[in-house]
């Protein structure tokens, strides 16, 4: 998982029938429920036992279409507008504004995944994607750079979790999955309090040596080809500078900033390819 620290309260949405292998994965994952167009009998039987029968299993009609108009009432005022039925796809990646015009098939896939994620993520938001999955999301921030920093730090943690030292951590007997996830997150942090460090050590059968800053930096050099999507334009080049540190090579954003030229210049300096979609993906 990209952000295992945020799994509590999660729901899983699946676009196809849930089979037994999928249900076996879900049965061990932290989530509050699953929604899908169908379930095999074996999958439904297994999921009905999760959380002592309290796990939410919902079947949705795949042909359902919500109303064309949606409305919200605020302090007695009713706002009505057309439903956002935009389906982000590769057609939004045609306007490549950088010197590097190359978007490999895998990058197109990842950029589309990033845009779809942004459509349903609390604004302001930035999304990192790689190998067909989201690896970091910065959501609900008040500035674009904070979105980028948050998404980048999550992407870094996602990649650091694959470090041999992390994969070789020896946990004490009986330490459950969620506690392991929390422990790995703390193990990779450099700002633990003394109390946190004491509690962390209790979770290991063998106390591990912390990864040094240089060891982390060296490992993160292997993070490359990352796709980044932003739900609105980048107002300053600092977003590009931070994104580059976390392996970003491809970017999609709406464009429209008075400083677009400086942002493009930064992308060109790093050899990035950036497309202007012309579409903001705000979600409030």
Predicted feature residues:
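ATP-dependent carboxylate/acyl-activation modules
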Residues: 1-250, 257-284
């Amino acid at each position: 998982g990209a952000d295992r620290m945020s799994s509590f309260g999660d729901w899983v949405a699946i676009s196809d029938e849930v089979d037994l292998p999928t249900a076996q994965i879900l049965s061990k994952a932290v989530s509050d429920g699953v929604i899908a167009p169908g379930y095999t009998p074996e999958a439904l039987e297994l999921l009905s036992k999760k959380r002592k029968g309290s796990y939410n299993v919902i079947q949705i009609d795949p042909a359902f279409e919500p109303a064309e108009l949606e409305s919200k009432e605020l302090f007695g005022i009713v706002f009505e507008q057309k439903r956002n039925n935009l389906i982000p796809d590769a057609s939004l990646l045609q306007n490549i504004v950088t010197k590097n015009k190359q978007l490999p098939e895998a990058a197109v896939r990842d950029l589309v995944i990033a845009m779809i994620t942004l459509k349903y993520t609390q604004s302001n938001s930035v999304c990192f994607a790689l190998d067909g999955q989201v690896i970091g999301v910065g959501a609900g921030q008040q500035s674009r750079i904070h979105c980028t920093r948050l998404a980048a730090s999550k992407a870094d943690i996602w990649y650091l979790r694959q470090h041999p030292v992390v994969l070789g951590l020896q946990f004490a007997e009986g330490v459950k999955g969620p506690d392991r996830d929390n422990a790995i997150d703390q193990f990779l942090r450099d700002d633990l309090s003394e109390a946190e460090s004491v509690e962390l050590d209790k979770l290991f059968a063998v106390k591990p040596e912390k990864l040094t800053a240089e060891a982390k930096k060296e490992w993160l050099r292997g993070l490359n080809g990352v796709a980044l999507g932003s739900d609105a334009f980048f107002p300053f080049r600092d977003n590009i500078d931070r994104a580059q540190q976390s392996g970003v090579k491809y970017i999609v954003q709406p464009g429209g900033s008075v400083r677009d030229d400086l942002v493009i210049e930064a992308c060109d300096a790093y050899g990035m390819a950036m497309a202007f979609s012309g579409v903001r993906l705000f979600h409030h």
